[in-house]
Amino acid sequence: MPPRAKKSLGQNFLKDRNIAARIAAQLHIGPDDWVIEIGPGPGALTRHIHAAGPARLFLLEKDHHWAREHHLHPLAGTPEAQVVLTDALLFPWERLDAAHPWKVIGNLPYNVASPLMWDICSRAPGLVRASFMIQKEVGERIVAAPGSRQYGALSVWLQCFTKPEWCFVVPPHVFTPRPKVDSAVLAFTPRTDRPDAVQSKRLAHVLRLCFQQRRKQLQGILRPHVGGDASALLAELGIDPAARPETLSPERFIALGEAVAMSAIA
C-alpha cells in the first residue's frame, strides 16, 4: 500500500492520467531539452514527461520515501533520469548551465508555490519554458492585469520575467487527498527583455515598499525612501503621484525601481 500524502509537505497526488498528460504537454518537450520535475511523488507526471523524450530528466524530491522509490524502481527505460533528494526552495537555480535548454514542471504544493515560481522564473539561466499546477486563486493573481483586485507583487514580478499563459483548471476530485479548492495549470515563457541582476534587486525592493502599503498613494509610500521630492520623481516617470501601486504596469515598476535606486544614490 503506497504511503499517505504528507500534509506537512503539502502533498496532493494527481491520479488522473489524462490531466497528467495535458500538463506535461504544456511544456512542449523536445529531444534536446533538459527537464526538471519538482516533487514527482508517485510519478503521475513523470511518465508523460519521459514519454515525450527529453535529453535529460532530473527529479527533485524532498520526500525521502519517493526519492528512494524513484532510485530503486525507476520507470522502465529511464536511465537518463536522475533523482535529487532536495528541497526545491533551496535548490541553486542560478547554477543551471545556460548552455542547455531547461524546462521546469511540477504539481507544486500550495504552500510553497509562490516563492518557488518567484525564484525559478527570475534566477534560472537557460530556462526556456515552465509549466506548473498551482492553486487557482494564485494563478488568477499571476495573470491579473493592472488595476484589478488580484494584481500584486507576484503578478508584477512574474510578468516582468515571463509571459504567463493560463492553460486550464483542474478540479479537486482528481487528487488524493482531495483539496478544498480548484487548481490551475499555467505555462511560462521567459521574456527577452527581462530585468538583469541589478534591476531585479531594485524591482524586488520597490515591490516590497509598494505592496506592503498597497492602499496608500505612491507619493506617500515613497516619500521616506527617496532623497528628493517623491511627487517630482513620479511625475518625471509619467506616473500620477496620487496613484496606488496596483495601477502600475510591470514596465512602470521596473522604471520606478531604477528611479528609486538612483534617488538614494544622489
UniProtKB/Swiss-Prot annotation:
GO cellular component: cytosol
EC category name: transferase
Keyword hit for Cytoplasm: yes
Reactions the enzyme catalyzes: adenosine(1518)/adenosine(1519) in 16S rRNA + 4 S-adenosyl-L-methionine = N(6)-dimethyladenosine(1518)/N(6)-dimethyladenosine(1519) in 16S rRNA + 4 S-adenosyl-L-homocysteine + 4 H(+)
Keywords annotated in UniProt: Cytoplasm, Methyltransferase, RNA-binding, rRNA processing, S-adenosyl-L-methionine, Transferase
GO molecular function, one term: RNA binding
EC numbers: 2.1.1.182
The keyword Cytoplasm is annotated on this UniProt entry: yes
Subcellular location: Cytoplasm
UniProt xrefs under Pfam families: RrnaAD
Annotated binding of S-adenosyl-L-methionine, by residue: 12, 14, 39, 61, 87, 107
SMART domains, sorted: rADc
Family indicated by similarity: Belongs to the class I-like SAM-binding methyltransferase superfamily. rRNA adenine N(6)-methyltransferase family. RsmA subfamily.
Function, in words: Specifically dimethylates two adjacent adenosines (A1518 and A1519) in the loop of a conserved hairpin near the 3'-end of 16S rRNA in the 30S particle. May play a critical role in biogenesis of 30S subunits.
Protein name (Swiss-Prot/TrEMBL): Ribosomal RNA small subunit methyltransferase A
Protein source organism: Nitratidesulfovibrio vulgaris (strain DP4) (Desulfovibrio vulgaris)
Gene: rsmA
